[in-house]
Amino acid sequence: VDISNNSWGAIKPFSDDFSSTMFMQDYANIRYAVENGREGLGTAFVFSAGNDRASGDNVNHHNFQNARETITVAAVKQSDVIESFSTPGAAILTSAYGSGVLSTDWMGTQGNNPQGKFPNNDYTYFSGTSASAPQVSAIVALMLEANPNLGYRDIQEILTHSSRNPDTASWKTNGANNFNLGGHLYNDDMGFGIVDAKAAVRSAESWQSQQTAHNEVFAAARQGNLNDLLPDLVNNVGKDYRFEISSDLKVEHVELGIDIRHERLG
């Protein structure tokens, strides 16, 4: 499989835990696919961010969405503002349209268009991040058609570079220094922006590097038992812990493993 689109996800926070017996094999399968899929270039996994903003959910609570091997997609309106249902979080890579999306309908009586909203009842509208993720999967297919030699990490980086940043959102600048002599714009709603098919394909056509699971480099820092209490969150001010990595790396992902004992998770 070159591209795996996943318009689904776990509902309860922390329920899809890759360290648990139930989901350990799922992560092993993802790792196998990024290491061996497409003859070692890696399968591209695309996941919906989810439609649970109202309940306070966050993609950081779900290992399928926050894994470095996956591309997590949020949903925006046609007016380029975030959809009210789209689950936020720092693990979102990009976004695509999540309402008013025209697609083929189910056949027969299972169809969603029985009242004839369209002259041809084979089509209907659908919405949600289940609609936005397949658009990104389709764009990834166009990227691979333009350049079959892209590694799965190249695909992620190209989407990072090529997504557009509408002025309908507020943006933060990350610490990168390899994009227009500065950092990337990012926010927790749209990721690095709204996916741009033309820009992504054009970038893929001229892309020279090949970043795969086999040339990925890691650096790690370990902190001992902090023996600290977590205060109630007031004005979004929490605890601040810092560590330093001395290796000279281009950082693509940061993974934090933490063991917290608390009466309430989430």
Can you describe what each PLM-predicted range is?
Residues 2-107, 158-164:
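Catalytic-core segments of hydrolase enzymes
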Residues 2-4, 99-190, 194:
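Hydrolase catalytic cores
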Residues 13, 54, 78-79, 132, ...:
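Short, electropositive, low-hydrophobicity segments enriched in small/polar residues
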Residues 50, 186, 194-265:
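Secreted peptidase-domain scaffold signal
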Residues 72-76, 179, 250-253:
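Short Pro/Gly-enriched beta-strand edge/turn motifs at strand-loop
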